[in-house]
Amino acid sequence: MVDFLAENNLCGQAILRIVSRGNAIIAELLRLSEFVPSVFRLKDKADQQKYGDIIFDFSYFKGPEVCEGRLEAKPELQDLDEEFRENNIEILTRFYLAFESVHKYIVDLNRYLEDLNEGIYIQQTLETVLLNEDGKQLLCEALYLYGVMLLVIDQKIEGEVRERMLVAYYRYSAARSSVDSNMDDICKLLRSTGYSSQPGAKRPPNYPESYFSRVPISETFISMVIGRLRSDDIYNQVSAYPLPEHRSTALATQAAILYVILYFHPPTLHTHQAKMREIVDKYFPDNWVISIYMGITVNLMEVWEPYKAAKTALNYTLDLPNIKEQASRYAKIIESLHPQVQQFLKEGFLREEFVLDNIPKLLNCLRDCNVAIRWLMLHTADSAYDPNNKRLRQVKDQVLADSKYNPKILFQLLLDTAQFEFLLKEMFKQMLSEKQNKWESYKKEGSERMTELADVFSGVKPLTRVEKNEHLQAWFREIAKQIHSLNYDDSTAAGRKTVQLIQALEEVQEFHQLETNLQVCQFLADTRKFLHQMIRTINIKEEVLITMQIVGDLSYAWQLIDSFTAIMQESIRANPSMVTKLRATFLKLASALDLPLLRINQANSPDLLSVSQYYSGELVFYVRKVLQIIPESMFTSLAKIIKLQTHDIIEVPTRLDKDKLRDYAQLGARYEVAKLTNAISIFTEGILMMKTTLVGIIKVDPKQLLEDGIRKELVKRVAVALHKGLIFNSRAKPSELLPKLKDMAATMDGFHRSFEYIQDYVSIYGLKIWQEEVSRIVNYNVEQECNNFLRTKIQDWQSMYQSTHIPIPKFPPVDESMTFIGRLCREILRITDPKVTCYIDQMNTWYDMKTHQEVTNNHLFSEINDSLGTFGLNGLDRLLCFMIVKELQNFIRLYQRLILRDKSGQETLRALQKVVTPVKGIVANSAKIYSAAIAKTQKIWPAYLDAIMKVGQMQVLRQQIANELNYSCKFDSKHLAGALENFNEAILADIQAHYQDPSLPCPREDNTLLYEITAYLEAAGTHNPLNKIYITTKQLSFFPIVNFLFLVAQLPKLQYNKNLGMTCRKPADPIDWVPLVLGLLTLLKQFHSRYTEQFLALIGQFIRSSLEQSTSQKIPEMPADVVGALMFLEDYVHFAKLPRRVVEAHVPNFIFDEFRTIQ
């Protein structure tokens, strides 16, 4: 018969592929369960209020038109719904595909069973497949994996959340219109069961059997599979556990399969008492907590409570004397085993001869250890007992008492067993690899000894007092030949023959009185020794390694091991070299990967890599978590060192008087520093002792592990310091900003110095790590803050700054800002608010408008540089850009609402436009015409002013940031600054040359050079924020004349001061000149340059017309508004870096030259 798993056996390959896919689906479900968007849980009030109207459960399907109608009625809900779709469609699609694959899995399994039934596979029926060893394993696994999928989904992704995600996917994707979509079936299968994994939650009635029966499966198939599992040892594991008391451990994998499959046939659990008694007697006579898949544990006492037959059958196991007997037995086993294992682990104890002579003894010890560890870990686990269930609590307390449970002792036994197992495996692997060479070498040695003895008895080779003996000569030659003829490939015959040869050599010594000659005796003894070694060597079988692999399975502890993390970390803190022992435990845990990967590998599935990566990644994550105690302890010591260096140790001057030496010695403090530094070095050594290890398919390099751990701890501490240090009280007078920045700078300097100090002791690049991680923290927080302004948000798993190994912590927001960078930015905006402060450009200083006291100045930005570095300034700059974009977008909406939808306003503007055309002319009776137009549009200006001033204020801040960045770049990195300036000028020259002569080269649109150089220029402050285009715009009617009117409306609020320029006339009616100019400049910059030309022409016309009118008076004087308008033009060309001729085209140059003197 063809091998069931052969590639040409279609029947075997079909079921193998199904089972392989089942394991891959479970891995995907486990992976995705960590990425459920929290918004679908609707846990906190903010989410409920914001998204409650757009997230629906399955009640949506009762009346989709009603729900959609409610959304369409409110444009803001529609907008939120669209934004929500853009942000979540990718992850929703991934979840849907996983859910769909579960449904497809059971459909494919049912189709396979139908094909078997209908005889599609020649000579194969359900019965014949179940008779085949691989066939019955695969059929049992196929149904079991489906059950595990359903349980995993319900445990990891709550029913309500599933429903909301499915409805969201249905609404947002094309699934509703797709004909071949099986959305209905998926929704029926995965609708909420009412189950909750929260502790103390009540179990729904008929759960999980009603859930398992949502897709009908052949009754015959289920009962036949249960029958097989009841009667057979389908994995042949009993041979690896010969002792009867280990039988339940031998059948543990099969027991887990049967436990899950029984839910597909509830009558067995409810009423088949004899069957359940048989099942319990075979699988659960001495255990009631089982692991069903990769460490997912269940307590039969709890889960079988609703089933009469199952509960009754289990009562014998849960009988108090039985529990006491089992727990006491394992207590005794541990007491006797632990010293034995520790003896084996002593240096030099496990020698090759000892191992080869004691294989059964060593394997028995390993078996007993693993069985004891398994029973105790499962039956004492907190997760296995519901604390709200009194009976479960009693059983747990009894187990803990009777087994004398001590988690530290159990953990130590696990460590020692893993180490023992690891050493034994390594020895066996080496012996197996050398087996043939050694055997041949012993054979050669033995044969040569016999040949030499034959030569001795020939009389040719002189040996003291050995007479010539032809019989013995011939006999020894024959023995040499026999030894030489032994064949390695036929180990059974060779072994038998070797035993006979040993006997013959013993007999020849006795019969021929050869004992009298010591040298001959020695030759014979040596040969016997070599023959014995040959027997030992031929007995080194791979079966021993296979048995060790089966016995050493630790997959049941995949999740439970986490409960020992604190003990592991405490052990490492006390003794860092403990890491070497932990390595063996992690490798033992890695063997759990064999379970899900076996079938995937057999099927040559492409899923092998992704599933291996998932489980290996989870294990490596756990290894990192355990070893994180080393960086944590290092940083604790480091904090003490920095405290001593900063506060206690006085810096030694370059010149020192001899008699002052004792004062500066400070031996106690320096000894303390040395002691702490030594502790840091020991921790480093501890982690580096763990050799490079392959955990699953991921290579773990201890040096990298240490560096990542140090980075993680640094990130955690710096992020916490930034979060706590930059929280501001908006009511505080004066602002807390500068004091807090100074404190922050001191804190960051402490971290920086400590890193500088530590780098040589732990062999890392301190400055490089510091810069990389601080920039990552700042950039990540800026990204999170900017998400508030983005429609399509950047999720953590999409962020280039967030990392799974070195995560940046997220903190709940304390105000409207998401992060510390947002709080810092808003505090700066608050204290430089143009409504309460006046910015004097020549001084780079903000003054309070009422008290005229200085509020802050450009030193603020050097303080930010000291505390957050250039990354912080750069991040602040990026955030201000987003804020400006938002303000400009709001402004466009405001313009459309106030101007373009107001008919009377448009009439006023149209009339004014007629009067001022042509702009080169002069408006007669200008004062009256302008004031009438301003009066009619009066309502518009407050909101307009607010928007312009906000943009202007942020542009002032951006200029200051650019100045600080440019200064520090030229100071700290003059070569970079010079290179960037030259490069920038060269590119601009090339672009200008290209526009004059298109045959010359120029960067094309798809070339990223311009984007990359822009990022560098902005980081170095070599840019002008006022030239930036923030938004794309369309033509707006009346735009130049509206801005002109707005400016003229604001001029009466301002007055000219020879020393300060334009200042606010009345603090009660606040306005700040520089933000006003920069706001208008930025706004006009977003549109076509002809708008700016028209706007400047209108101001020129206003100046000329007003001067014309004022000179006709008896005492001509220059009106204040004209001075304001002239100042505006002067400042406009100054800030925009335009040539003066631009405004001189509209106003005669002598007026510009003289207006200050006239005033």
From Swiss-Prot:
This is WASH complex subunit 5. The keyword Transferase does not apply. Pfam families: Strumpellin. The keyword Methyltransferase does not apply. PANTHER family: WASH COMPLEX SUBUNIT 5. Belongs to the strumpellin family. GO terms for biological process: protein transport. Its main location: other. GO terms for cellular component: early endosome; WASH complex. It is found in: Early endosome. Acts at least in part as component of the WASH complex which seems to regulate washc1 nucleation-promoting factor (NPF) activity and is required for its membrane targeting during endosomal sorting. Component of the WASH complex. Keywords: Endosome, Protein transport, Transport.
